[in-house]
Regions:
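Divalent metal-coordination and catalytic microenvironments
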Residues: 58, 83, 147, 203, ...
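Residues within membrane-spanning alpha-helices of integral membrane proteins
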Residues: 12, 16-19, 50-51, 57, ...
Length: 394
């Protein structure tokens, strides 16, 4: 029964890479929208970052759930910790969007507001905007709608004291299969009918395989998930979609390799990469607010002689520099405040961080520092309603 006393440094590095991929895609989007319309769009690359996030989340949450165990009350500690970690920064960004629309709506992209959309955005519930699209007010928050649904399943598993994988596997698979039935228009609840849910399952399978030290069975299971995703994509478009199976296989292989090789090569991950991974949640949520400033400023001064790739490079570099600052001075204080409110007495009497405190520090993009002191208990193709590369709407 393996234990884990140190962080998964390679997983932390993957979080940084995943967030950076999304930022690159959005930097291209902002450049095309505000500076040079000929800037190429790299939507598929952004998708890779999001799918990595989902797989990492599935992996981490299984380990966190095992760390909490099946003791009475573990489910509400888990739920409160998830809220403490995810909600504060997301609510802040959503509030900024609402305030911007109210105060200067003509200057804001996607500035339509309705009470229903605002409430749904704060509650992580899918809803239609006035144009009929399904996304929250803070555009990149669409991934958190999936994350919160996944956390709800994890909470339910802990509450009824069942192995999270045993509960989540059939539900996530059914959600993926339901993508075949999803209408072009209809209830916003169809948002969950998407095969991206299987990335969470892949991460969970990796966690279970690592805990049981059964790499061969894990690889076979991941291959089955990839084939399932390829089959679903092929059925949706009525033609063979090999890439739809290859992409989840690659994502799974990357996370699998990061987990299994961490003890051997994880120590070589630089500190600045670890810091970037720690700030990945802030990078992901904050960059839509600041990244458009670079191309907009260059356009305002008429610097159209600057090549688009220079604009994109400056934008990405600026966001990577700002993210640790936002993490330290905004994200972390907000999380600490929420933790004090929702998780009183999180520190144990011996000064060791309790499981719930460890969970609190792990956001939807977090992984490296949550899988500590664990013990064993037993045993890409997105659908049309998902914006490629998490296209920014914030």
């Amino acid at each position: 029964m393996p234990t884990r006393q140190q962080p998964f440094r390679l997983i932390q590095a993957l979080r940084y890479v995943a967030a950076a991929l999304v930022v690159v895609v959005h930097a291209c989007y902002y450049s095309a929208e505000r500076f040079d319309e000929h800037t190429p769009q790299l939507d598929r690359i952004g998708g890779l970052g999001v799918w990595l996030f989902f797989a990492i989340s599935g992996f981490v949450m299984v380990l966190v759930g095992d760390d909490l165990g099946q003791a009475p009350g573990s489910w509400h500690r888990f739920a409160r910790a998830r809220l403490a970690r995810v909600v504060p920064l997301y609510w802040l960004m959503t509030t900024i969007k609402v305030a911007a629309v109210v105060l200067a709506g003509s200057l804001v992209v996607n500035s339509a507001l309705s009470p229903g959309t605002v409430i749904a955005s704060y509650l992580f519930i899918p809803s239609h905007d006035e144009a009929g699209a399904i996304h929250p007010l803070w555009g990149v928050g669409w991934t958190l709608v999936f994350e919160m649904a996944f956390y709800a399943l994890m909470t339910l598993a802990l509450a009824i004291r069942i192995d999270p994988l045993a509960l989540c596997a059939p539900i996530l698979t059914l959600a993926a299969a339901a993508s075949l039935l999803r209408p072009a228009t209809g209830s916003a609840w169809w948002f969950y009918a998407d095969d991206v849910t299987l990335y969470f399952l892949a991460g969970m399978v990796i966690a279970r395989g690592w805990r049981a030290r059964r790499p061969v069975l894990t690889v076979l299971s991941l291959g089955g998930i990839a084939v399932c995703m390829g089959t679903l994509a092929s059925l949706r478009v009525e033609r063979l979609e090999v890439l739809a199976a290859v992409v989840p296989l690659v994502i799974s292989a990357v996370v699998f390799s990061a987990v299994w090789l961490d003890d051997r090569i994880g120590r070589f991950v630089p500190r600045w990469v670890m810091a970037g991974g720690a700030a990945s949640y802030a990078l992901y949520l904050v960059h839509p607010l600041l990244a458009p400033v670079v191309p907009a400023a260059l356009a305002a001064v008429g610097a159209y002689w600057v090549p688009w790739f220079v604009v994109v490079t400056i934008t990405v570099g600026a966001m990577l520099a700002v993210a640790p600052i936002a993490h330290r001075f905004v994200d972390r204080p907000l999380t600490r405040g929420a933790s004090r409110l929702l998780l009183p007495g999180a520190r144990s009497g011996h000064g060791r961080r309790s499981s719930s405190r460890a969970v609190a520090r792990s956001g939807p993009l977090d992984a490296a520092r949550t899988a500590t002191r664990v013990t064993v208990r037993g045993g890409m193709s997105s659908t049309s309603h998902i914006p490629d590369g998490a296209a920014p709407e914030g």
